Amino acid sequence: IHYHAVIYQALKYAMKTDMVPQNVAMKVDRPRKNSFQPTFLDAEQMQKLFEVVKGTRLELPVLVAAFYGLRRGEVLGLKWDAIDFNRGTLTIKRTVTEATIDGTMKIIEQDSAKTKSSLRTLPLVGSFRDYFQKVKEAQELNKKVCGNCYNYEYDGYVFVNELGERMRPNYLTEYFPKYIAKHGMPKMRFHDLRHSCASLLLANGVPLKQIQEWLGHSDFSTTANIYAHLDYRSKISSAQAMEQGMLLPRSDDFGSRWENVTEQGKITEPDLNPGF
């Protein structure tokens, strides 16, 4: 779909500027979008995943993405100035992505989130306060040990290695699914941690509107379209509320003998062949 759209727009511009006589892409049907089904981990599977990545470079990115539902670029875009240890907040305001530009793979940094709603401040719960504190202390120690060998170009970023090199987005995309598959986990993408976060929030009774704000979706329809089908628990609650609020007739012999009602409101003998 993406390639078709790019070619279509390029030829549209070329035709507008008289570079080509017609847009031949108009004669090609737009490819159908594949209905991708994300993988949703339940709480038990999530605990197993945490054990699988424990002690690896994947551990903290996985924990952050699973708990906060962050996108890959939001995880790797975290800097220390976004973490307020005193106030206990985590602000999502940067992204780091990877794309091919002029045939070369390049890192793209943006000091703004994907959309205005993506810019959000979330609570820094106790466990994550400890995680980040330990990482920050380790970085300071690495700077002293490495000296001039330390790469200060990415100083301030949370996810760097012992030499200060920043973790690449494609590292998470490529190595995460391969590594966890070797350890018996279901086939899934790194982005599915975000989906799993939403499904766990739903399972614990968090309304879709609050999930929208937690994930940073630009509008409610985005959240509803992706996750509403998981929200069966709320439908059960609605049905129970209706049962309590509405006195339904007893089901004794229900439907065994229906009487006809005329337009004048009179009741007649039941029609054994109603014709519907």
Say what each PLM segment does.
Residues 87, 98-100, 104-119, 126-128, ...:
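C-terminal secondary-structure termini that scaffold catalytic or DNA-interacting sites
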Residues 32, 40, 96-98, 129, ...:
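Catalytic-site neighborhood detector that most strongly recognizes the C-terminal catalytic loop/helix
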Residues 1-3, 16-80, 85-86, 117-119, ...:
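Basic, Lys/Arg- and aromatic-enriched nucleic-acid-binding interface segment
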Residues 50, 89-91, 100-101, 110-134, ...:
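C-terminal catalytic core of Y-nucleophile DNA break-rejoin enzymes
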Residues 51, 55-58, 68, 122, ...:
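Short, basic (Lys/Arg/His-rich) helix/loop patches that form interaction surfaces
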